[in-house]
UniProtKB/Swiss-Prot annotation:
Record's protein name: Porphobilinogen deaminase
SUPFAM superfamilies given in the database record: Periplasmic binding protein-like II, Porphobilinogen deaminase (hydroxymethylbilane synthase), C-terminal domain
Comment field (misc): The porphobilinogen subunits are added to the dipyrromethane group.
E.C. number: 2.5.1.61
GO function terms (MF aspect): hydroxymethylbilane synthase activity
Pathway: Porphyrin-containing compound metabolism; protoporphyrin-IX biosynthesis; coproporphyrinogen-III from 5-aminolevulinate: step 2/4
Reaction it catalyzes: 4 porphobilinogen + H2O = hydroxymethylbilane + 4 NH4(+)
Cofactor note: Binds 1 dipyrromethane group covalently.
Subunit structure: Monomer.
């Protein structure tokens, strides 16, 4: 069989390149007849670093240009952090695999303090996420939360320069880049419920390319797919993007029972709406939609309306 060259569209950040290299290595390990190249692309989210993501329209900021590369034939597939993947895909493209989830937690990183409880009143904490900000403010209303944009190395450099007393970012990204030692501890999900899909990698490609779909299929992790699909169903009903104070985290309690927790928070932390439920794993998406409806009826609709400018329909 002749060799097929697959081209992965990827952002140029260290973390995005790590993720793309990981998928490249897996594809080449699984298939002797495949060579993989990386196509580096700058996205809108990479170009605008001085404005909070939520202000520039948080949906798809890190994927649109990658999708254009697949649609016009420059690339065959793209690797995404699942927490960045929009709910809707352009015609002809789709999410075809979710790899086994790594650490889904948020990490507390500080050069002076071992634990968030040790932060003095008024301490400055950096994060780029409204979800993290809402939960931080709910737990520690005395803290100053400041926007922290940029890639992982940039964020750590800003902490080291003394601009922040602590920063909070995804544990998985730090670990993938070898920064295990920078994590003081991982925030428990009771303190900071993770983002939809956090810690998992997704693969998007042209859905009509059956040969490519067969090559990618072994990378799909069924347990992770079912968990993240339930989380995304909740998020879809709430019209959430990656820059909205929505959290959802699903666990498999046994082979068949899915436990899903969801949260919507006012960014100032004064209101946090929480729901949870269980269902057979095959009904995870239904559970996600039902829990989203519960959140809306509890008052999350008003919180989200302030952010979106309209109530989720």
């Amino acid at each position: 069989m002749s060799k097929r060259t697959l081209r992965i569209a990827t952002r140029s950040s260290a973390l995005a390149l790590w993720q793309a290299e990981f998928i490249k290595a897996e594809l080449e390990r699984l298939h002797d007849n495949v060579d993989v190249e990386l196509i580096k692309i700058k996205t809108q989210g990479d170009k605008i670093l001085d404005v909070p993501l939520a202000k520039i329209g948080g949906k798809g900021l890190f994927v649109k240009e990658l999708e254009e590369a697949m649609l016009d034939g420059r690339a065959d597939l793209a690797v995404h952090s699942m927490k960045d993947v929009p709910m809707e895909f352009p015609e002809g493209l789709g999410l075809v695999a979710i790899c086994e989830r790594e650490d889904p937690t948020d990490a507390f990183v500080s050069n002076q303090y071992e634990h968030i409880d040790q932060l003095p009143e008024g301490a400055v904490v950096g994060t780029a996420s409204l979800r993290r900000e809402a939960q931080l403010r709910a737990n520690r209303p005395d803290l100053q939360i400041k926007v922290l944009r940029g890639n992982v190395n940039t964020r750590l450099a800003k902490l080291d320069a003394g601009e922040y007393d602590a920063i909070v970012l995804a544990s998985s990204g730090l670990k993938r880049l070898g920064f295990h030692d920078r994590i003081r501890y991982c925030l428990p999900d009771t303190f900071s419920l993770p983002a939809v899909g956090q810690g998992a990698l997704g693969i998007e490609c042209r859905v009509g390319d059956t040969e490519l779909l067969e090559l990618i299929d072994p990378l799909n992790h069924t347990d992770t797919w079912d968990r993240v699909s339930a989380e995304r169903a909740l998020n879809r009903r709430l019209e959430g993007g990656c820059q909205v104070p929505i959290a959802a985290y699903a666990l498999l309690e046994d082979d068949n029972t899915l436990w899903l927790r969801g949260l919507v928070g006012a960014v100032d932390g004064t209101q946090i709406f929480r729901v949870e439920g269980r269902a057979p794993r095959a009904e995870g998406e239904r559970l996600g939609r039902e829990l989203a409806e519960q959140l809306l009826s509890m008052g999350a609709d008003k919180v989200l309306a302030e952010i979106y400018g309209h109530t989720p329909r």
